[in-house]
Amino acid sequence: MLFLFFGDFKASLIVGASMPISLFLTLILMSMMGFSMNIVTLGSLVIAIGMMVDASIVVIESCFRRQKSTPDLKQAALEGTKEVTASIIASTITTIVVYLPLATMKGLSGQMFEQLGFTIVFAMLASLIAAMMLVPLFYTVFKPKEKENLPIDKLLKKFTTWYQKILRKLMKRRKTVVGVAVALMIGTVLLAGTLDMELIPAADEGVVAVTVNFRSGTTLEKEDEALKLWEQIAEEEPDVEFYSVSISGSSATLTADLIKKRTLTTAQIVDKWNEIAAGMTDMDVTVTSSGSSMSSMMSTSSYEIDLQGNDRAELAQAAEDLQAEIEKIDGVVKTENSLVNSTTLAKVVVDPLKAMQYGLTPIQVGMTIHNVLSGMNPLTITNDGSEYAVWLEYPEGSYDDLNLLMDLGLDTSFGTVVPLRDIAEINYAQSQETIMKQDGLYQVSVTSTMTSEKIFDAQNAINDLVDHTVFPDSVTPADSMMTGMMNDELQALLQAILVATFLVFLVMAMQFESPRFSFMVMMCIPFALIGSFLLLFITQSTISMVSLMGFLMLMGIVVNNGILFVDSANMLREEGMSTEDALVASGSTRLRPILMTTLTTILSMIPMGLGLGDNGVMMQGMALVIIGGLTASTILTLILIPTFYLIFDKRSRQERRAAKKLAKSQRSGKTGDAENE
């Protein structure tokens, strides 16, 4: 792409050399910080590569322009670099300050993107050093020549001529331009409201986890027998490469690793197995996609609604009614109610007086029953340095019936045997496996399992159902753990965006020595969102923590073109040009470097935007936001910046005329008073 615009191998090599040099310096700084190569740091390097050449392109373009009036290469390199030094420093700093809040964030966002922020900061500093020190040096050593009459130059000349004509017409219709831009912005906001939201996009890592929860007291043999069904399902699935099973207590997990070239995605296999699990009423089965990345924590096809209340009976009824309504929603495979997961307990109540007659205590009776039902570990055998626990159990089926248990003979202290039924009775009761409370209130969770294709539609339908359901006075909906985490992280990101906006404004105010020009450039940031939201909508992507990170990064990139444009226009006005002529000339001269810097960044983002690789989808939203935002901002910068410039300049002239008129009237008043005296 560089060679396409320059048409000179040496010029392309000079600019291209800034990438490996900047990358090398970045890796050194990353190593000093103790960063590792992972999906986040590699993704940040991909993002940074496209921006590493921006400053170098601006510098060499300026050197080429200076060489036309200054034959001496060294002089052209010095003057060309000096001309854009302030602009590229300001542009680099605006990019850096955007990532500073990112690098200092806490919580899940900080864990995920702290290294991303620091890595891009290191890359921008390294690219600035390369652009200001190495590009002018290489320019004088390699002596590149700007080729003319290139195919791209012919297109650019035609486009520049057309742009100049259009820009002059649009500058005379400033209200229309602003009105159309605002209308597009409003339409984009409405479009953004149709996009689904999630915390982190789920990566397809090719791992499916089946978690089976059994009722407490279920023997290992029965658990193993139940799991054989899932083992058979895994064996019959052609996309499963291998699987493993682990059993611990009353739960078991089957983890299936899928082949690389599979016919179904991980989400489709999860949906398929969830439909099978929905028909299993004798066990609680949860099927999810799994993996090693942080996204696996979020990649679930279930959605949880929590209810709170101080009346447990009303809470249970409200949860049961809500569960029944949720089951009617399209896309919901099954629902679970945490209060429904109760266990029927058979309590053996020992009469202490009757037990005392036989020299027994309730504790002794309880220990005997425990040993009979669960077995006991009387001794441990050591053989060749290894210890083996000896476990004694009654034969299977000896006491699996309450009548048999009540016939259990207990040895008394008098040397006789008494049946358990003579000193105890059986009472039945329902007992919750788990009783949840939060802030002193009972809490129940209604969990819905949905198909991956309709997960967001089902979630929206469930939320609408909860919003329109009239609950008893003692029952109120509460945020689930995942919803609370999502709200906290999104709020932290929005705060980071606000801090970054303020820092960018301060940097530009110092650069232009005027808050007016800074505000003018900042106004282009919201309009860049037009392209971002439009591309997210076209690709049916979600708004997530990762895509919001893209919005944050977009701020630092978008203003760079605006800084170059305004800085160039101010310099031309200082040389005596009129405002309109300076804006047209600035747009014409900055057109090629703006297009080059934008295209290099966009092209570097395309592989990430396509979501290539198993984990590519995780960073895809960020790339789509930047690609769409940069495309829109480049077009709007060339049109809106001149329009805003004229509007602000007109107001500034009116304010100056009003100030002069006021000062003149004050002087006239003082002169009249002096004459009267």
Q: Predicted regions: what is each one?
A:
Residues 4-65, 506-589, 595-614, 639:
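Hydrophobic transmembrane alpha-helices and their membrane-interface caps
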Residues 16, 60, 65-93, 113, ...:
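Helix-loop junctions and hydrophobic alpha-helical segments within the transmembrane domains
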Residues 32, 36, 103-111, 181-218, ...:
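Transmembrane helices with small-residue packing motifs
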Residues 49-63, 84-104, 111-150, 254, ...:
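Transmembrane alpha-helices and their membrane-interface boundaries in multi-pass membrane transporters
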Residues 84, 151-200, 667-677:
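Signature of alpha-helical transmembrane segments and their immediate interfacial
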Residues 198-261, 275, 312-345:
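Extracytoplasmic/periplasmic
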Residues 222-301, 356-373:
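Solvent-exposed, membrane-proximal periplasmic/extracellular interface segments of envelope transport
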Residues 316-450:
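Beta-strand-rich non-transmembrane domains
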